[in-house]
Design a protein with these regions (language model features):
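A cross-family phosphate/adenosyl-ligand binding-site feature
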Residues: 3-56, 60-63, 67-68
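Short beta-strand segments
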Residues: 13-15, 74-77, 108-109, 143-146
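Short glycine-rich anion-binding loops that position phosphate/pyrophosphate groups of nucleotides
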Residues: 18, 52-53, 77-80, 148
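Charged helix-capping and loop-helix junction motifs
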Residues: 87-93, 122-123
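Glycine-rich phosphate/pyrophosphate-binding loops
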Residues: 99-119
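Electrostatically charged, flexible surface regions
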Residues: 120-167
């Protein structure tokens, strides 16, 4: 969120509970509980949603925000979203839901929650670079940060959906 704050107005609309492997699942029966959330960062509008990551995007774009955002950031997922794993990912599902609303999206993942040195250093510059590019109409960006130290970091691999064994 701190990295996004330097890019413009930030809204956080996130699941109230862990939602791993939810894919693009949405809630079609029943109500979703949406609560304002006191996010520990200045100038951030935040809500928790009792639903899936894709539900969060639907609620944000369809109910909470008066204007479409320029971009949706999804994640940060703990664990890579590569190869077939992207089919199961709630992080990817949320980015795909943004695409359904006509909003460009970037899904972010990192190897492990406690391996964030490269992510903390490169998230903002990578996001800025991707935002400056024209994304084809029916595509999202899927960014996976390695779980290594800055000394071990070998640079950015720009690729289409990479194979799981590439990591």
């Amino acid at each position: 969120v701190q990295s996004a704050a330097g890019l413009g107005e930030v809204w956080v609309v996130a699941p109230a509970a862990q939602c791993s492997a939810m894919s693009h699942r949405i809630t079609v029966r029943g109500d979703l509980e949406v609560k304002p959330y006191d996010f520990p960062a200045t100038g951030v509008t935040a809500y928790s949603v009792g639903g899936t990551p894709a539900d969060c995007v639907k609620v944000a774009l369809g109910c909470l925000m008066t204007e479409k955002p320029d971009i949706v950031f999804s994640g940060i997922n703990a664990g890579y979203n590569v190869g077939r794993d992207i089919l199961y990912s709630g992080t990817i599902g949320a980015a795909m839901e943004a695409l359904c609303w006509g909003v460009p999206a970037i899904a972010f993942s990192v190897a492990e929650e406690d391996e964030c040195e490269v992510l903390n250093t490169y998230l903002e510059p990578v996001a800025k670079e991707l935002i400056s590019k024209t994304l084809p109409q029916n595509e999202i960006w899927n960014v996976n940060f390695p779980g290594c130290t800055l000394e071990e970091y070998k640079g950015i691999l720009w690729d289409r959906i990479p194979d799981q064994n590439q990591y």
